[in-house]
Amino acid sequence: MSNSLAVVRLDPGLPLPSRAHDGDAGVDLYSAEDVVLPPGQRALVRTGVAVAIPFGMVGLVHPRSGLASRVGLSIVNSPGTIDAGYRGELKVALINLDPATPIVVNRGDRIAQLLVQRVELLELVEVSSFDEAGLAATSRGDGGHGSSGGHASL
């Protein structure tokens, strides 16, 4: 498998996705448009690039931690998933989580980060039950959504 990612620059006025520091896992994605996000609102924001994720890998679009913590800018479907077969422009579903202040995103602002990771492409096999399939019960069972205990103050 290659260690390169094919990128098409759809907007020549924007930089290619890039790492802020050597060794960073993600590459920063830039906004291709000016957007004002009122409190609680969301927008699908163009990045001006398309990528060809290699087969057996997935692209994951994550919020930039500084923007999330400082101004409440996040991603609606975090992380966004880019499948290997998708070849269109990357778009980021941004949301303003601040309860009072609009967020202004300017063209050229770094708005998200793209991580590319290997993914196991498992074959789905229908079984009538996990016991019949020889998959032993676990201590967790079907417990979910807080079944392992809450926060000390809740």
From Swiss-Prot:
Sorted UniProt keywords: Hydrolase, Magnesium, Metal-binding, Nucleotide metabolism
InterPro entries tied to this protein: dUTPase (IPR008181), dUTPase-like (IPR029054), dUTPase-like_sf (IPR036157), dUTPase_trimeric (IPR033704)
Cofactor(s) the protein requires to work: Mg(2+)
Class in the EC hierarchy, top level: hydrolase
Reactions catalysed: dUTP + H2O = dUMP + diphosphate + H(+)
Alphabetized Gene3D superfamilies for the sequence: 2.70.40.10
Pfam family, one: dUTPase
Pathway per the UniProt entry: Pyrimidine metabolism; dUMP biosynthesis; dUMP from dCTP (dUTP route): step 2/2
Molecular-function GO terms, alphabetical: dUTP diphosphatase activity; magnesium ion binding
Sites where the protein binds substrate: 64-66, 77, 81-83, 91
One GO term of the biological process aspect: dUMP biosynthetic process
HAMAP family from the UniProt entry: dUTPase_bact
Full protein name: Deoxyuridine 5'-triphosphate nucleotidohydrolase
Gene that encodes it: dut
